[in-house]
UniProtKB/Swiss-Prot annotation:
Modification Phosphoserine, positions: 122
Domain RNase III: start-end pairs: 139-262
Cofactor: Mg(2+)
EC class: hydrolase
UniProt keywords, alphabetically: Endonuclease, Hydrolase, Magnesium, Meiosis, Metal-binding, Nuclease, Phosphoprotein, RNA-binding
Biased segments, Low complexity type: 13-22
GO cellular component: nucleolus; nucleoplasm; nucleus
Effect ascribed to mutating residue 178 to D/S: In snm1-1 and ran1-114; loss of activity
UniProt record, GO biological process: box C/D sno(s)RNA 5'-end processing; meiotic cell cycle; nuclear-transcribed mRNA catabolic process; RNA metabolic process; rRNA processing; termination of RNA polymerase II transcription; termination of RNA polymerase II transcription, exosome-dependent; U2 snRNA 3'-end processing
EC numbers for this chain: 3.1.26.3
Residue stretches making up the DRBM domain: 285-356
A single MF term (Gene Ontology): RNA stem-loop binding
Protein name per Swiss-Prot or TrEMBL: Double-strand-specific pac1 ribonuclease
Organism phylogeny: Eukaryota, Fungi, Dikarya, Ascomycota, Taphrinomycotina
């Protein structure tokens, strides 16, 4: 009986210990949850204060005030210093937390009118409006990921030893996808716009349109260079001024639109962005390879025809300029990537000039 009683008392002690452990676990979980909520609140407040500081700096520039003392003179009580102190305190608390909070990208002022609407269709882009409205992302996850630079991802997850775990956090995979679709969309657009342009010319034109220079300019139209989230060290290294980094952000946004199920909207958006560039393209007529023969058969009995090199040193960039001479007078001159093409184009122009005013060049 005594043995049974001691055994029963042991079970009671064990049960009590388990209960205490469970209770401590719940308190710990509650503490962690509370800590996370508090961390989130610190983060949101920190973000709001940071925006306020940016606004105050902008106001300083507009009013030509350049020091914190100027602000404190305008607004009593060392306002700037107090705000800056609160910001640093909140940032310090946030950085000490183990569980990171991913920053949410702010909306560019030009895009605020789109936030309450559904994504625009091609019909919603107003004629002549440039830049076209930024198609909003529907996925909250993509909204965060698209502006998350890899440097910031490693900064908020410093103990992550497996880089693959961060692939869904930063925007490099989105940039890879967007780069492919930027090429595809541009190919579709110029293939349709320039039906008489050969493959080589189309390739050169596409290369001009899809390079980092174009993507960087498009990104800055929407303030992506300001919205991009970088690490502290990346900011110090001036990555925000890097053309490649900002261009990648544009491509990441394009990739995010694709994953968001908005491929047609993305195509219309790129089409509108490229519109001014396409409008400035002057397409030459296809080369008439029989132009020299036509000119010879029509005018050789009426005078002497010759072709002279007048400019250019060759190569696809510089090319050649060839003049068509009739009875010692220059009738036309034309450029070509090689001497044969330049001569053919000069003959094409000469046929038109002589047809209109032959008497000017007659013997």
């Amino acid at each position: 009986m005594g043995r049974f009683k001691r055994h029963h008392e042991g079970d009671s002690d064990s049960s009590s210990s388990a209960s205490d452990s469970l209770s401590r676990g719940r308190r710990s979980l509650g503490h962690k949850r509370s800590s996370h909520i508090k961390n989130r609140q610190y983060y949101i407040l920190e973000k709001k204060i940071r925006k306020l500081m940016f606004a105050m700096k902008a106001l300083l520039e507009e009013t030509k005030h350049s020091t914190k003392d100027d602000v404190n003179l305008v607004i009593p009580g060392s306002t700037w210093s107090h705000i800056e102190g609160v910001y640093e305190m909140l940032k310090s608390r946030h950085d000490r937390q183990n569980e990171p909070v991913i920053e949410e990208p702010s909306s560019h002022p030009k895009n605020q009118k789109n936030q309450e609407n559904n994504e625009p269709t091609s019909e919603e882009f107003e004629e002549g409006e440039y830049p076209p409205p930024l198609p909003p992302l529907r996925s909250e996850k993509l909204k965060e990921q698209v502006f998350m630079h890899i440097s910031r991802a490693y900064e908020i997850y410093p103990n992550q030893s497996n880089p693959n775990e961060l692939l869904d956090i930063h925007n490099e995979r989105l940039e890879f996808l967007g780069d492919s679709f930027f090429n595809l969309f541009t190919t579709r657009i110029i293939f349709s716009k320039f039906p008489q342009m050969d493959e080589g010319s189309l390739s050169k034109l596409r290369a001009k349109f899809v390079g980092n220079e174009s993507a960087d300019k498009f990104a800055r139209l929407y303030g992506f260079d300001k919205t991009l989230v970088l690490s502290y060290s990346a900011e110090k290294d001036q990555l925000r001024k890097s053309q490649k980094v900002i261009a990648d952000t544009f491509e990441a946004y394009l990739g995010a639109l694709i994953l968001d199920g908005q491929e047609e909207t993305a195509f219309q958006w790129v089409s509108r962005l490229l519109q001014p560039k396409i409008a400035n393209i002057t397409v030459q007529r296809p080369i008439d390879k029989l132009a020299k023969s036509k000119l010879f058969h029509k005018y050789s009995t009426l005078g002497h025809i010759e072709y002279r090199w007048v400019d250019g040193a060759g190569g696809s960039a510089e090319g050649y300029v060839i003049a068509c001479i009739f009875n010692g007078k220059e009738v036309a001159r034309a450029w070509g990537a090689n001497q044969k093409d330049a001569g053919s184009r000069a003959a094409m122009q000469a046929l038109e000039v002589l047809a209109k005013d032959y008497s000017k060049f007659a013997r």
